[in-house]
Amino acid sequence: MAVFFGGLAYGINNFKLYDLYKAYFVKSSFIEENYVEPKETKLIFPEKKRNVIYIYLESMENSYMSKDLGGMEEVNLIPKLTQLANEGYSFSDTDNKFVGPKTPVGSQWSLASMTNQMTGLPMKVPGDNNTYGSSGNFFPGAWTFGDVLNNEGYEQTVMVGANAKFGGLEYLFSSHGNYKVMDYNFAIENGFLPNNYKQFWGFEDDKLYKFAKDEITRLYNTGKPFNMTLETADTHMPGYVSPQIENVFNNQYANAIYYSQNEVYKFVQWIKQQPFYDNTTIILIGDHLSMCSDFFKNVNKNYNRTQYNLIINPSPELEISKTCFNNRIWSNYDMYPTVLAAMGVKIDGNRLALGTNLFSNEPTVFERYGYDYVNKELAKKVSDEVDGFLKELSRSEIISKSLDNYGYILLVDNIDEAG
């Protein structure tokens, strides 16, 4: 799972010297000028609040489709996800339905992607270690997707097959929304697995879906609206070889992708058979682009690789612009208001943080200013003028110092070491 190991190394190793210089010394007030405070934005939930099942699919790309669908493969590696895409809503930056979001600064690994979609903000890589934040101190001033739902009485669980403490994922979800965090350690401690059990990063996706079915059933039986968030792992490079996997292709990663997409499909079909489905919206999104460089070594460098994205069974009350799906320049930030809108939430102004409700006619920040310009601004250090904004956002002196060091990222455990 890239959030825990490979993604961090990838982020640091690909952080070029000039980018590092910009992050520390070249200033920008872009966030200050374009940030919409979610906590101050009027949100109207439907009388019957919808459940949401939010699935981050490790390294899942549209590029895995066949060339006739706009992918890079001779044979479609994700036929079941392609089938599902015809049942729901996807957003594309071309006329082709199967082209997803841009990948701006601070969104290239799993934890960053989750943070983007939860907060509507980018995330930068600190230089100290794998500890992003601490309990109660992960973006402490941000009002996130999880905070919004928690404030509306939702029961929330996040489930991952790895150790959620590594990288700070646990802190993101426990600090914002009072999520129940079910990870590898939780599974061992609660007898879901033998004490010595370890596959890949912790436990494999076959077990993730099994445990998730039980937890979703428990959430439904509370009688409260619920949010079940999952992060898969089997398609992290080099690809986990499940005992049930079929060797359809002469490539381990291709087989892992093919097997994974089929398991996702079966899980979605299970959800559709449950009594809560009519009032439940499903989100499927690739967390980031794959880091398995060998798998893409023969791909044209100009090919536009993008994350798979799909919204299934949105609220019947959702207002949809006829022109909202194609030729959109968007990113993970936009998922924050877009998912809420899919759940039937009315958002005053259709914007939260740096994100835009993609179902609306409101332009994203990238559409308004241009992708290259926005990406360059987000790579810079925050300006001195934004100091008051940051203090209000963070509500603590120490996070303001961390933000000053890294530019709007988050609190790390040791500010002196981080700086």
Per-region residue spans from a language model:
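Transmembrane and membrane-interface helices of multi-pass
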Residues: 1-22
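A general marker of short, structured functional hotspots
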Residues: 14, 26, 31, 273, ...
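Short extracytoplasmic/periplasmic juxtamembrane "stem" segments immediately C-terminal to an N-terminal membrane anchor
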Residues: 21-38
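Solvent-exposed soluble domains appended to multi-pass membrane proteins
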Residues: 38-50, 54-419
